């Protein structure tokens, strides 16, 4: 690769040095990479990261956080004028879907009922969520789990924001279970508390009581893998740019802890369509199968897709040709620094 390991100080810093025998050259015959070294800092939280960046100690930061988004971004998702002279903004569609999942191994009627699961999908205004909580960064995830930009992603809105329909579904559940006042607990970490509180307010309007349990990230991951949660906030970033990567979360052979099916959703039809898609040689036919699978999965509503994310980088103007890509990989081979 273009860089080689030089130094690692645990929880503090990782240093990579230019590889003197790297095989690539630019169009002028100059050996790549241009940079002599890369230093990666390990910081305790996003606020510390932002402060280091503001003080000029970091050359770029990636992603947005509630603690600093309003300082760096306008309400329309553009770079704040205060930073125009020394920072530039890079944005790209990101192969990441943020969602809330149901643990379907839980036997509580509220979890098992498609009425409640669909009601929540109808009852969350994703557009407002993007506007007010994300400063316009991202797209409402209302067309399925596969993010926009991947072949096989949906074209039709499956769950538009519809309070009337959401209330009707909740009322239908209450008629079937008059002894139950539906209540659910959503587990998250502190970074996404604002998003979960937004959902809590929205669902209160349709007659659902949503409690929020804030857990350390490590505990949340462990319980998500073992099925110890009712609802959980999660994200799925593609390992490779193919929609199969997203659909694998709903295949019965991938139940956690042996695979990424955190919801324990199970459908013979989906399993069969998945195997068929893996056998198909023609890309266009496989993409149509992906689209069909996504639609059928969402009809059962094992998850609530919230938004399709965007990759965002705030970069010092001292840095040239950093670039950005849909998987948010960091390619520094041709990057320079003034």
Identify what each model region corresponds to.
Residues 1-2, 32-37, 55, 85-87, ...:
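Alpha-helical secondary-structure segments
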Residues 1-48, 72-96, 164:
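Aromatic-rich, solvent-exposed beta-strand/loop patch
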Residues 2-4, 139-173, 192-194:
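Structural transition elements
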Residues 10-12, 138-139, 172-239, 311:
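Ligand/substrate-recognition segments at binding pockets and active sites
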Residues 39-51, 64-67, 190, 213-222:
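Short helix-initiation/N-cap motifs at beta->coil->alpha
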Residues 71-90, 227-229, 242-259, 316-320:
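Ligand-binding "clamshell"
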Residues 115-118, 130-133, 209-221, 225, ...:
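Extracytoplasmic/peripheral linker and loop segments enriched in polar/acidic and small residues
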Residues 313-338:
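Long beta-strand-rich cores associated with HINT superfamily self-processing modules
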């Amino acid at each position: 690769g273009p860089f080689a390991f030089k130094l690692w100080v645990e929880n503090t810093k990782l240093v990579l040095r230019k590889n003197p025998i790297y095989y690539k050259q630019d169009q002028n015959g100059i050996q790549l990479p241009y940079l002599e070294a890369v230093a990666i800092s390990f910081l305790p939280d996003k606020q510390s990261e932002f402060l280091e960046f503001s003080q000029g100690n970091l050359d770029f930061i990636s992603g947005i956080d509630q603690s600093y988004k309003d300082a760096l971004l306008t309400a329309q998702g553009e770079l704040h004028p205060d930073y125009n002279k020394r920072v530039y903004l890079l944005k790209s569609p990101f192969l990441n879907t943020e969602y809330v999942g149901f643990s379907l191994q839980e036997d509580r009627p509220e979890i098992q009922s498609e009425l409640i699961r669909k009601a929540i999908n109808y009852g969350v205004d994703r557009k407002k969520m993007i506007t007010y909580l994300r400063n316009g960064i991202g797209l409402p995830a209302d067309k399925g789990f596969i993010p926009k930009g991947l072949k096989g992603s949906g074209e039709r809105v499956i769950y538009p924001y519809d309070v009337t329909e959401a209330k009707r579904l909740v009322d239908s559940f209450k008629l079937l279970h008059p002894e139950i006042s539906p209540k659910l607990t959503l587990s998250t970490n502190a970074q996404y508390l604002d998003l979960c509180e937004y959902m809590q307010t929205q669902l209160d309007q349709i007659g659902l009581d949503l409690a929020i349990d804030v857990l350390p990230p490590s505990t949340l991951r462990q319980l998500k893998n073992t099925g110890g949660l009712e609802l959980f906030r999660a994200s799925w970033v593609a390992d490779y740019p193919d929609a199969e990567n997203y659909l694998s979360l709903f295949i019965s052979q991938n139940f956690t802890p042996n695979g990424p099916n955190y919801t324990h959703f199970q459908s013979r039809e989906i399993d069969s369509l998945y195997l068929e898609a893996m056998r198909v040689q023609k890309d266009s036919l496989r993409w149509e199968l992906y689209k069909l699978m996504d639609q059928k999965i969402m009809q059962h509503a094992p998850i609530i897709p919230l938004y399709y994310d965007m990759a965002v980088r705030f970069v010092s103007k001292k840095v040239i040709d950093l670039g950005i890509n849909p998987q948010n990989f960091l390619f520094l081979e041709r990057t320079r620094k003034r």
